């Protein structure tokens, strides 16, 4: 008999709106014993069936919904259906944008909570971020092998969020061939190397694809500063947009080395590039003291907010770094500024940029707004899925 989780009276409203999370505070009782990650049924206080979900006893999110259809079984066929639904959309995007690298599964927004899958050529990179996802590992891999027999599958579930679920960090080959040290993918006419084994996340920031295209369109004739450059995809975009010069800054020499290889891979002019290993905050202050000026600054920092208690300090960090960037821009210059922190609301981020401009002594115009690329969809019932936000700001 399936274990049943009974909600407290009046706590079913979010599920009726098809939100996929059940928090521990919404629960009246659990009927039966469930293993971590096991599939359970969710009922309201009157015993009415609401959803089928994965149980996460170590997490504040006590259950994550697999399905709102009572007759749907969570088996290999279920995962195959979800994969096929997701692939239909990615096929269209891949053809439109010339892609052989994209996010295949974006967790809750593709009906597979706690599961991220990126495809790079014929390599599938898997992240299992919840107890339910881990519990279904073998079934999911079987579904992937059924749908993608040509693909190797590599595990990058080496992310700290698994600790909140009581799960160990895992990484390694699941099946097929080991990925090469650097694998090239195509994006809007660019070739970009992906480091599947050692790179950030699954190896590459696919979510910034549209923003890179925007940077390319803004770059013509401009002197560009690419902050938190990682492997230099924004630098490639700027060079393809005929920038005057692009300086890429990161604290890691290894990613800067890959950035240089990306420039060479696209047969672009290395003499127009500079790679600086430094702390961005310190370097911006040094540039300000030296009187350096730029026409386009790309500010794409790592996540500043891991939990709500860090939001206030993150706001200060975003404000400080964007103030410095605005001070380095010539009149008419463009700042492309981003936040990948899901806990940072877009309206608050916009206010931070406005305050940064005020402190910098400049007026700015918001001329364009960005979000994650379309292979990272946001299902209507789950607004938390919108984590990446950005603005193009013109300095007056």
Curated annotation (Swiss-Prot):
Tell me where in or outside the cell this protein is found.
Cytoplasm
Gene Ontology molecular function: any one: rRNA (cytosine) methyltransferase activity
What name is this protein filed under? Ribosomal RNA large subunit methyltransferase I
Q: Which reaction is this enzyme known to catalyze?
A: cytidine(1962) in 23S rRNA + S-adenosyl-L-methionine = 5-methylcytidine(1962) in 23S rRNA + S-adenosyl-L-homocysteine + H(+)
What's this protein's family per the entry? Belongs to the methyltransferase superfamily. RlmI family.
| Superkingdom, taxonomy of origin | Bacteria
Cross-referenced CDD domains: AdoMet_MTases (cd02440), PUA_RlmI (cd21153), RlmI_M_like (cd11572)
Q: What is its EC number?
A: 2.1.1.191
Q: Which gene encodes it?
A: rlmI
Q: What class of enzyme is it?
A: transferase
- The reply to whether Cytoplasm figures as a keyword in the UniProt entry is yes
Q: Where is the PUA domain?
A: 2-81
Provide the organism lineage as a comma list: Bacteria, Pseudomonadati, Pseudomonadota, Gammaproteobacteria, Enterobacterales
């Amino acid at each position: 008999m399936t274990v049943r989780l009974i909600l407290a009276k009046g706590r079913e409203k979010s599920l009726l709106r098809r939100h996929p999370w059940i928090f521990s505070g919404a629960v009246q009782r659990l009927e039966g014993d469930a293993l971590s990650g096991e599939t359970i049924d969710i009922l309201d206080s009157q015993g009415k069936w609401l959803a089928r979900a994965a149980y996460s006893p170590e997490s504040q999110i006590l259950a994550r919904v697999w399905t709102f259809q009572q007759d749907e079984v969570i088996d290999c066929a279920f995962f195959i259906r979800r994969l096929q639904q997701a692939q239909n959309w990615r096929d269209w995007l891949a053809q439109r944008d010339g892609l052989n690298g994209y996010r295949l599964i974006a967790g809750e927004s593709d009906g597979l909570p706690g599961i991220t899958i990126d495809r790079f050529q014929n390599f599938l990179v898997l992240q299992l971020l919840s107890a339910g996802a881990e519990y279904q590992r073998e079934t999911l891999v079987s579904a992937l092998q059924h749908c993608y027999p040509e693909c190797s599958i590599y595990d990058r579930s080496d992310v700290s969020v698994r600790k909140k679920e009581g799960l160990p960090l895992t990484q390694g080959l699941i099946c097929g061939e080991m990925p090469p040290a650097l694998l090239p993918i195509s994006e809007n006419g660019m070739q970009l190397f992906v480091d599947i084994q050692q790179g950030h996340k699954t190896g590459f920031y696919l979510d910034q694809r549209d923003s890179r295209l925007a940077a390319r369109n803004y770059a013509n004739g401009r002197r560009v500063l690419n902050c938190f450059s990682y492997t230099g995809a924004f630098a490639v975009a700027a060079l393809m947009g005929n920038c005057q010069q692009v300086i890429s800054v990161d604290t890691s020499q290894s990613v800067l080395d890959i950035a240089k290889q990306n420039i060479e891979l696209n047969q672009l002019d290395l003499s127009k590039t500079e790679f600086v290993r430094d702390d961005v905050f310190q370097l911006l202050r040094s540039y300000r003291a030296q009187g350096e000026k730029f026409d386009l600054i790309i500010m794409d920092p790592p996540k500043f907010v891991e939990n709500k208690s860090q939001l206030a300090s993150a706001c200060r960090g975003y404000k400080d770094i964007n103030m410095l960037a605005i001070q380095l821009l010539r009149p008419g210059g463009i700042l492309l500024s981003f936040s990948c922190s899901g806990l940072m609301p877009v309206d608050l981020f916009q206010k931070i940029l406005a305050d940064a401009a005020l402190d910098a002594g400049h007026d700015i115009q918001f001329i364009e707004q960005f979000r994650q690329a379309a292979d990272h969809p946001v299902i209507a019932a789950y607004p938390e899925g919108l984590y990446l936000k950005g603005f193009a700001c013109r300095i007056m």
